[in-house]
């Protein structure tokens, strides 16, 4: 029996169970987890005739340049927090139960929002974050946990706070704001709530933190 988690617009919606039928005498194939390789970006894209048609950096530029979009902006925020924690050399694991793991074993969930979007807006967006409990997935075993809960020890809420379209640049960390809240406090304040606004987080005690202090403050908050 294996489970598949379905997501719609980044929201965990349901868990579907599927049974693998093993026929008598049939040997089930085993495919161990693939060890992730960190690419440099210089790797060539090879055509059937053996000629290079581009480099991996060309693909990255083509696919992931929308840093104002919610998907790429979210991945960028994870990398920014990883840099602050000094763990940026570790490879990102998509769909893992938490986003980052500090050197001393603190599981970190990074959530991202912003006031500006890539599409035409009638008004600035209101920062809102997904905080729904989930069934944790283990990337090594491909199994889901039985208990639905928030998987990390602490949340880092990242807000791209810039509001001028002409100068907006998510690569400028000075345009970001960071707020910390331990998962225990989120559970106490918001229960099984799926989303939360920035204003609600601040009222509930989220700590605003400078980028340069993220690592020390995360460690300090978790020691309380």
Predicted regions and their residues:
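Nucleic-acid endonuclease domains
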Residues: 1-106, 111-224
């Amino acid at each position: 029996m294996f489970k598949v988690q379905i997501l719609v617009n980044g929201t965990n919606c349901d868990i579907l169970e599927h049974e693998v039928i093993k026929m008598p005498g049939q040997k089930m194939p085993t495919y161990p987890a693939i060890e992730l390789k960190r690419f440099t970006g210089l790797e060539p894209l090879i055509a059937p005739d053996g000629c290079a048609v581009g480099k991996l950096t060309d693909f990255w530029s083509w696919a992931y340049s929308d840093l104002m979009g919610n998907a790429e902006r979210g991945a960028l925020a994870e990398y920014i927090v990883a840099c602050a924690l000094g763990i940026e050399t570790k490879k990102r694991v998509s769909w893992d139960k938490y986003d980052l793991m500090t050197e001393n074993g603190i599981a970190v969930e990074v959530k991202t929002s912003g006031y500006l979007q890539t599409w035409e807006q009638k008004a600035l967006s209101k920062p809102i974050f997904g905080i729904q409990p989930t069934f944790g997935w283990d990337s090594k075993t491909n199994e889901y946990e039985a208990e639905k809960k928030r998987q990390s020890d602490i949340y880092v809420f990242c807000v791209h706070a810039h509001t001028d379209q002409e100068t907006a640049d998510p690569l400028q960390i000075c345009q970001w704001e960071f707020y910390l809240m331990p998962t225990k406090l989120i559970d106490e304040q918001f229960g099984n709530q799926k989303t939360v606004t920035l204003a609600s987080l601040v009222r509930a005690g989220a700590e605003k933190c400078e980028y340069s202090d993220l690592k020390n403050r995360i460690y300090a908050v978790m020691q309380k």
